[in-house]
Amino acid sequence: MAFTEANEREVQSSYEKENVKIIREEEAKDQESTDDIAVEDGTGTSPDLNFFSTQNVMQMNFEDEYSEFSNEDDEAEIDNSFADSIPNEPEIPDMQDEYSRDSHSQQSVEEQNNTTNTDEDASVNEFSVAADISDVNTLGKDNSESTEEPVNEVNETATLGNEDVGERSGFPSEGLDNEPESQRDLDETGNLAPEDLKDEVKSVHEFNEPNDLRQQEESYSDDDDTNVNEFEDVNEIENEHQLSVADEDQTSRLVKGKMIFVGKEDFGEEADISNSVFIEQNGPNSDTVSGFKETSSIVNSSSTTEKPGVALDSQNDTSIFNEEQTNSLTETFNDLTLDHLPENVESEPVAGKENETAKNESGASDNDHKANVHVFVLKSSEDAITLNEEKIATQDDPLEAPTPIVASSSTIFLNSNQRNDELSASGSQEPHPKDGTNSTSSLPLDTNNLSNSEPPSHVLDASSETIEVIQTIKKLQNQVPETIKDEVGKKNTAFSPGTSLSTNHVKTKSRSAHNNSTSPFSTAVSSWLNPLRYPSDKSPRVISSYLESVFISKPRSIGDAQKLEILEYLQSQSSTVSNQVFTLLSNFIQNPLFVLDECFDEFRNLILMHNSHTVHTVVWKTISSWTSYDYEMQYSSLSIKNCDSDKAIRKDLDRTFAPEILSHFFSNRQQLEPTDNIAESTANLHRVLRSLAIVLPQVGYTQGMSWIAGALLMHLPAPQAFALLVFLFKNYHLQNIFSSEMRGLSRVLHQFTRLVEDYMPSLAIHFKRQDIKTCSYASEWFLTLFAYKFPLEVVAHLYDILFLYGPGILFNFGLALLSHSQESLLKLNMDRLISYLKEDIFLAFKETQEGENYDTSLFVKTAFSFEIQPDVLDRYGNEYDILLKSEHELDSSLEEMRNRHKSLNEHFIMLSDSMANLQVEHENMSALLLKEKMYLKNQTVEQASLKSEIASLNSQLAKQKSEIEQAFQGDMEAIIAENLEIMVESQSLEDEIFRKEKQLAETKVNLAVLDEDHMMALQKWSQLMNRIKTK
């Protein structure tokens, strides 16, 4: 359907832009005069974009095709939603968003609807529709000819909505030519042939390429005959470029996700998307045109049906799904479980109207066209998740061997750094017990929200490998056959929370027939901690307990001699156990991993319910031999060495155990020799503790270790007791609670305190009011592993459970003690409360007040009634780490402030001394100043008197001068005259002296001449005499 120039002036600006874009494409490709004429007439259309706009669809006569809609409101609603029902409309994503932003859009639609009937005939004559409404709908039912065509490009445009809430989305699908129906190549069912459909899809994508966009921009610069003004053309090019970029981005995301989103056309900021659905193609032919048609036929039906998430046209001849497709979707949906869905996502079945004609004409087998479609109804905007295409395997399909699942253990005594070091040293992840020994949640406990797809964090640290394990679990669960998933609900209720202990249990079978047993104390978490087993030898090993995880993390084997030794002991004690227990223990000695994996239920029930001394010894001997045999060999050399802790060990042993208890520490009672005595038992215990201090020098010896070693020596020889003690410290991380600063113990006590607040808030408040700290009563529980007050026979039973479930079970033991005596504790005050917690709380589990036997089964049942989820333990542990870090920071700040205060105090003292000295000096200077001021005042008075005296003296002097001058004036004149005479006489005498001096000088000269002549005469004489003598 197209529009004339008269209609074009009435249509909104967005529709004019579309026509201009189509005209420019034809001009760029053909450059023919006929195209120029088409542009001038405004009737040029692209064969690929005949249904490009929803406005074209809205021009159809709805009264002819949908006669049941007579109400004007219904017609307006159809105008807004009918474009959604076109499954193959090749519209660029987000184009509807651009249209919705046009301020004249609503007005243009109303004008368009008013002129539909009058202009329909002329419009059909100029531009005929490629297919009517029924032909458009039948595109969703192409079953046979189109099943082998690839849809890589189709999937890119097969987006019927926008996954981003708050944005409107276009509804791309296959385009239809504007040729008459008689000229189109149609298959037998009346649908487009696969070749035509592929060509149309290709043309749509060619039109959306950036090169075509640049060509359109170039052609736009040469277009002088357009009937749209220049301003609108420029805006059209910019919008076209933005839409192309958005289209490429969205289609690339859809191709990666293999997903088709079906939803409402309008996604405003306040839009309700509760009826929107995701459709995931999981069938074997999901990459075909048929698969695309099947899924793209599901449309939103908010205006035509009341069922959310499903679009049905009950009055139209054509149906959205044929019978086979509907059955396929229904069966697929019924097979889905909530394990595949998040908590806030529900599944909705998809139904369609049967179409027998389309079914008979398709001629395709079920496997050629069926596609498993998952429909998830979104309940909130946060539920918009991408569903990756994964094939749901059937029972006959072998599963590919994934990476073995090794769940991490609840290392309750490890902080983040220690856990990283532990993982680095072991080179693998620490497994976690299948029965969820550490699962806990804050009250009230809501187990309905837990599912296999949402495993809890099972370690105490944010740096753990939880994310990797969760991803592996999710991947494997998506591959689990439906028949196997049905077996998840089978649970062993022998030790379920709230049930009484009994010997009834379901025997665990081989891997091919898995029975997901329930955790003895955590029903909610066991559904994840008990992973599914698979009917194939390639299935991963399933971690059933903490003990099994330890065996897996440190695989080794022992010699036949060690096995024979334990078997001989078991044989010697065969009278104390039943045949079934004897067989189970024999198998455990031969291969512990086999028993823990294949016979876990039987072994668990034996550990929880037995009261045989033989079971303790056999199980402990086996664990020691399989895990720590090297330490057994080293014991003889270590026990004779000296260490720094000898003195502390000897001092502690003398005050810890009674003599009758020490006599039991040399092996077990059946192995006592007549020569054994208390001294030898004490020395034996001393050697074990000393060897442990040598092996673990960073731990050394701490009070409480002797209780653990003593309990082990009750049932094991010293070498095996030492090896098992090292095993506990290294693999169960007890070395952290015995560290020098007891940081691990403080961390455990903090976690235990928070658990008491969760499960027994009234008791926690009572402790708070009575100022009872957890460390005042629970420290010895964890330091001695509850061996401090319980009889050692009961302690041995608790150690069996500890070995099986890991250190997390200690929290359950502590909660069991408090819970069983909660009413009594609430009635006691502070002094009596401390005494009760230290002494009498253990007596509450006695079978009778006068007897010595303890009801171990009641204690175990009470302990297993608490569901302690690991993520809560993680949170409490991390909470302590944060508090400890904050405390360290505060301590550092406090120490810095103390040092600062000390330096400032010293400076203050120095300044105070200086100030005192200056004060004394100031006082002295003040006294001196006062003295000087007085002296100055006296001097001023004296000066004034002296000045007056000077003045009088000066006047007297002047008077005396005048008198003297007058008295001696005549004498002076006589003296002056006499002086003149003397001066004249003196002058004459000086002249006489000058003449005499001159005469004397002349005489001296004459004398010199005479002396020279005399010398000459003497020389001559001498010469004469010499001559005379020579002659």
Curated annotation (Swiss-Prot):
One of its GO terms (molecular function) is GTPase activator activity. It is a single-pass membrane protein. It comes from Schizosaccharomyces pombe (strain 972 / ATCC 24843). GO terms for cellular component: cytosol; Golgi-associated vesicle; plasma membrane. Residues 43-59, 105-117, 278-306, 420-429, 436-455, 493-505 have a biased composition (Polar residues). SMART domains: TBC (SM00164). Residues 1-229, 278-317, 339-371, 420-459, 490-520 are annotated as: Disordered. It is found in: Membrane; Cytoplasm. Belongs to the GYP5 family. GTPase-activating protein involved in ER to Golgi trafficking and polarized exocytosis. Residues 610-806 form the Rab-GAP TBC domain. The gene is gyp51. InterPro entries: Rab-GAP-TBC_dom, Rab-GAP_TBC_sf, Rab_GAP_TBC_domain. Keywords: Cytoplasm, ER-Golgi transport, Exocytosis, GTPase activation, Membrane, Protein transport, Transmembrane, Transmembrane helix, Transport. GO terms for biological process: endoplasmic reticulum to Golgi vesicle-mediated transport; exocytosis; protein transport. Residues 1-32, 195-217 have a biased composition (Basic and acidic residues). This is GTPase activating protein Gyp51.
